[in-house]
Amino acid sequence: MSVFDKVKSIVVDQLGVEEDEITLETTFADLNADSLDIVELIMALEEEFDLDIPDEDAEKIRNVGDAVNYIKENQ
């Protein structure tokens, strides 16, 4: 499973959206995620990929592509 597919699966689980709504360009705001949703999403990504994402980096992750790129660069 690719990083994108794993991230997409986590977004679907965390935000309760349909998988076909998610592309690399999809922002979390597009999916009606509030700040708490985003914190929980970042925590789920950290757990899945065994990463520690500092707050200053988490603030830069605004869409699915940002998350995928961050994970690929820091794994």
UniProtKB/Swiss-Prot annotation:
Q: Which SMART domains match?
A: PKS_PP
Every copy of the Carrier domain together lies at 1-75
Q: Which example biological process does GO assign this protein?
A: lipid A biosynthetic process
Name a single GO cellular component: cytosol
Residues recorded as bearing O-(pantetheine 4'-phosphoryl)serine in the entry: S35
Q: What processing steps or modifications follow its translation?
A: 4'-phosphopantetheine is transferred from CoA to a specific serine of apo-ACP by AcpS. This modification is essential for activity because fatty acids are bound in thioester linkage to the sulfhydryl of the prosthetic group.
Q: Fetch the InterPro entries from UniProt.
A: ACP, ACP-like_sf, PKS_PP-bd, PP-bd_ACP, Ppantetheine_attach_site
Where it sits in the cell: the answer is: Cytoplasm
Instruction: Give the pathway listed in the UniProt entry for this protein.
Output: Lipid metabolism; fatty acid biosynthesis
Q: Which family does it belong to?
A: Belongs to the acyl carrier protein (ACP) family.
Name of this chain's protein: Acyl carrier protein
* Gene transcribed to yield this protein: acpP
